[in-house]
């Protein structure tokens, strides 16, 4: 009984309970205010109906993805009172504008440190004009150049990435930068944490940035202060506050580790035990990552520093040159192919992550193989995949057989029949696949953090590694074909037809509001 009451007390007085109660209090206050004015209900209803209609017209004319427009317009016309209030609260842009302005200024001030080597671009122009145009676009509008002299090691599962990361962290001499969406205490984080503390004692500069929502209920209260006391410089990106606001949508979904400026890790693997199968949640957890060494690491170094200084808020720029690699023995003198690490921000007008994916799809000639944990594509992605399949390209896509979110799976299933009818082959992995991979035509591949859903494509800070004619491209392909043969089941039109009417109705409703989920 003592254990029960202790557990109950922990739940009642937990940070999560406090946040839920504060959010609930705000909702109840709005409802109370509305019902207090019930004697004027007719006037209020007609006023909000007019406001809802005006907002619907305003949204219709915004330069925004049509799916977002539809997700707001339907409730504004159907339930104008609550939808109008929700719209004004959830799209309040003051906080977003402040962060956006800081982000724009920081990217502009760091641009001189991310200059494209024109010789590399000239060589690429001769070799492949399509990739050349993509590199020019990402450099000009994303702010990240493409590199040669960069090696890539591909990891098929989180366990491989973890082992390599531990090995490289132990070799750190100057600095370690970590930026992750999720950190959870357990075997994985405990081992990394121990290394970081030891390195900080040795004089290595250690910085950690983690998302305030992704790790909200996984770490103790004020955990960043504990790490600071251990010599680890730490910031929490956009700490979750119990306020109804649009800024809570913009999360730092990146996974970056940079060591001494010569080595970087990127991919889908967070710092939690399920990512290395030390804890089972949804069957076998399949994830992927890459380790890059060489010139291309600089993009990840600057990506981290940009975000760090925005969150730090002191407005002081680093002496960025101090983070250039000093140990040239770790730098490859030459390496085949081209590597482009890039980031994507929800606070600008460029959907870099989606456009890189669309470029791969539109330029594919033989095949496109994709893995994604969340399949909620917008019309542009669906149209591009359909056109590729109809034109004879082998388009295959793997999603989880065991989902981590039931409603996401329900929405994903609503796309199955449509995509299969277009010629896309869809498979489900017999576990949970968290890898975000694209590979095409034995030439190009992307491994990173960008899912095929609205949150990744439009709302989150993301990053990925684009590879062209790098040996690791063939490893990404081989991994896809291996799990396709051994661990996947193909979804057929018959499977889609067997879904119950209720299941299809739920999917249809959820799909309308999927941009807001």
Model-derived features: positions:
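N-terminal localization/anchoring segments of enzymes in phospholipid and broader phosphate metabolism
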Residues: 1-355, 359, 363, 387, ...
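Glycine- and other small-residue-rich loops at beta-strand/loop junctions that grip anionic moieties
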Residues: 181, 373-374, 408
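A short, conserved beta-strand element enriched in hydrophobic/aromatic residues
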Residues: 287, 371-372
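Short, solvent-exposed loop/turn segments at secondary-structure junctions
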Residues: 216-217, 377-379, 405-406
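C-terminal structural cap/anchor segments
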Residues: 393-457
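Helical hairpin unit composed of two closely spaced alpha helices linked by a short loop
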Residues: 374-395, 400
